[in-house]
UniProtKB/Swiss-Prot annotation:
The gene is ACLPREF. Expressed by the venom gland. It comes from the Eukaryota. It holds the Pfam family Pep_M12B_propep. Disulfide bonds join 308-388, 348-372, 350-355. Residues 197-393 form the Peptidase M12B domain. The active site is at 334. Zn(2+) binds at residues 333, 337, 343. This is Snake venom metalloproteinase ACLF. Its EC number is 3.4.24.-. GO terms for molecular function: metal ion binding; metalloendopeptidase activity; toxin activity. Residues 1-20 form the signal peptide. It is found in: Secreted.
Amino acid sequence: MIQVLLVTLCLAAFPYQGSSIILESGNVNDYEVVYPRKVTPVPRGAVQPKYEDAMQYEFKVNGEPVVLHLEKNKGLFSEDYSETHYSPDGREITTYPLVEDHCYYHGRIENDADSTASISACNGLKGHFKLQGEMYLIEPLELSDSEAHAVYKYENVEKEDEAPKMCGVTQNWESYEPIKKAFQLNLTPEQQGFPQRYVELVIVADHRMNTKYNGDSDKIRQWVHQIVNTINEIYRPLNIRFALVGLEIWSNQDLITVTSVSHDTLASFGNWRETDLLRRQRHDNAQLLTAIDFDGDTVGLAYVGGMCQLKHSTGVIQDHSAINLLVALTMAHELGHNLGMNHDGNQCHCGANSCVMPSVLSDQPSKLFSDCSKKDYQTFLPVNNPQCILNKPLRTDTASTPVSGNELLEA
């Protein structure tokens, strides 16, 4: 009995390293099993919410202890956030989730100034963090021990498809004047000339997405929430906040013709947004998330400079990877087009091997905007004057997962 107890204690104290495992993100060639320990202090007598505004976790990476600091992404959901799906006979059903705790966080690693993190704490810790310049993924292991998590480098995930992933936007590059040195300095977004802007966002998951996730709306919901949480992290340096005001799942059938021709699908989706969605859902921008395989290497398409326009404030995104970060980066890229950003040319730099806006999406994920993207956005604001992103959305510190039954409202 004593020997068994000692073994259990050792497993909890020291990470286990494995050579290969199949995880949600795919086949992983090298990983560690870790046991994150929550170390957030709670004042004596205080009522502890399920998901605090700030949390800290300790665990080991490569044998070295790390402390992950997390802060809740307040304002991730608007106060009037809604979800819509369709009954088998085609009736539109909209729910308004109760306003309570949510479990999506941004964060950093202690003593690493360049670290970042985007984490879901809904069921264990799931997401990604940057540590000492390398991207790591973390997710709970489906073991009897509910505290066990896998941590692994992004580069150790076997790629499902070696073909390059591309944006379908075509653009003629312009030569840019040298960017002011303010972009290289440790200045606030306001000091760099980025006024606070708010984008009220609707995500639509098409019928193929519903089929891909076996009609499990919870999985689709969590997948989308993680995407938008990461998008907020990416756009924080530009002082842009994305508030999710609606999630619509085409659970019965597609409401437009979704084809492998991305330009046709984008045009149809833009028309549908103008004639249907805008009539019943207040929002600034809509993105279609589809499980169709677009022709060629295209995984996304959007209208350049279309933000706040009735038809053109849209994009279409292929759900092309089992790694949530990669799909989030694709959507962040297409939203960049909506905000006036062109593709990066060779003269564009962000201090990393790749940036957010290349025409060919890099196999080294980057959440940094180039100097060119920053200038494009700064030019877009006064020239296009997008009024819809000026207003602060109805926001709340927290939001919940949907409830059923008496919260169903037929439109």
